[in-house]
Amino acid sequence: MKNFNPIMGNNNMPEYISVISSSQCARIRIDDIEVIEQEGRKLHVITPDREYSFYESMKEIIPVLACRAFYRPIRGLIINFDHVKEITGNMVSFHSGQCVTMGKNSITRTRTAYKKYLLRYPPYSLGEGGEYAPMIAAERSRPELS
């Protein structure tokens, strides 16, 4: 039996998932999800406000998250780049204060994917001599429009 059900929005993409378990029934806005962790057969869906736990497999929930900023660095973890504040060392920090620690290889792949995600949203800076430094310098030297 499915313990969650996607609720479709106007653009034919799911906006919410309904979570049904023996102890709770809830409707979670997909864009509010920060982290999804798998612990055995149980999924923990973490939002800035609370954590929801229910029995379901990752493969059932992944299609619902398609075409959004979700990234799966390891088999039992999905993070939402829209909620990431920063990635430092081996830790991903979220705007809500939640943190996720990863191993060296996983954090390297996650950092690379997060950089690609961030490059979709200018302005950005890679510092002196970075790949985009000439483009940024040209923007700064352009006279202001009146």
Question: Where is each model-derived feature located?
Answer:
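Basic, polyanion-interacting recognition surfaces, primarily
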Residues: 2-146
